[in-house]
């Protein structure tokens, strides 16, 4: 009885997977894959289309579609929402009205990279979300018989008192997935300071305002039978030091002390 039940379950599960695959947008047409490593607006010109394998001869730009869900990590909980298939992105194509992809025509689309920032309106801060599996996000281009999804023109914003924005808050992160203390799980750290006890990180801040405030968040961990500390130096200043308590480094079930 147990063997019969298991066989029926496996057949049902296999049919479910097959049904999902056959309904995917990828099941029909020719698809061309490309990657991005950051979030922003990207430009695709005629040369790039040719480089990824798309023939631009007799190409009607109105029939171009771009699909992709961004590069953020999938939810951990099965109950959380996730797209079951690739979603079409609204794009803008310069010069598509004549039905020909000319040399000066190009595509603009907004792509989400593998890493992201999550804003908190209550604390007026942002938290960095690192994709621990990939430093690239992938998108797909296809050409079909139907018109692609396009960016719609929004209604103009009329303001009696226009504001000129001259400054903004810049967010920069440095995170390398190099060290896993227990060689298990998804908790990774960067440089190992056991031997080379100093490391230098250069963060690019272009056109930074002099004497403007800076907020720094640093995470670290130690496994040591004695108390240890990690000092953080910003330019020539020493803003703070992490003090780590001792842990039983010889135990098979040892833990680690961390700050972040």
Give the ranges of each region predicted by the language model.
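Bacterial Sec-dependent N-terminal signal peptides
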Residues: 1-22
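Structured catalytic cores of large enzymes
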Residues: 20-37, 52-260
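Ligand-binding face of N-terminal immunoglobulin V-set domains in extracellular IgSF glycoproteins
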Residues: 40-44
């Amino acid at each position: 009885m147990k063997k019969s039940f298991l066989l029926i379950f496996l057949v049902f599960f296999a049919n479910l997977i097959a049904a999902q695959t056959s309904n995917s947008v990828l099941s029909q047409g020719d698809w061309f894959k490309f990657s991005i490593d950051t979030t922003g607006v990207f430009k695709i010109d005629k040369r790039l289309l040719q480089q990824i394998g798309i023939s631009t001869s007799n190409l009607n730009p109105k029939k171009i579609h771009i699909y992709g869900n961004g590069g953020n990590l999938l939810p951990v909980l099965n109950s959380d929402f996730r797209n079951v298939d690739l979603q079409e992105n609204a794009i803008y194509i310069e010069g598509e009205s004549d039905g020909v992809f000319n040399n000066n025509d190009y595509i603009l689309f907004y792509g989400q990279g593998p890493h992201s920032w999550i804003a908190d309106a209550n604390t007026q801060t942002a938290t960095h979300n690192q994709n621990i599996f990939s430093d690239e996000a992938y998108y797909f281009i296809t050409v079909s018989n139907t018109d692609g999804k396009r960016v719609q023109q929004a209604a103009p914003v009329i303001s009696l008192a226009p504001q000129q924005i001259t400054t903004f808050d810049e967010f920069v992160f440095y995170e390398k997935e190099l060290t896993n203390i227990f060689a298990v799980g998804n908790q990774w750290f960067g440089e190992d300071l056991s031997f080379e006890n100093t490391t230098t990180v250069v963060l690019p801040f272009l056109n930074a305002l002099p004497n403007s405030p800076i907020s720094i968040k640093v995470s670290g961990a130690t496994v040591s039978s004695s108390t240890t500390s990690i000092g953080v130096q910003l330019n020539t200043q020493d803003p703070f030091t992490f003090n780590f308590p001792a842990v039983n480094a010889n135990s098979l079930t040892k833990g680690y002390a961390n700050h972040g």
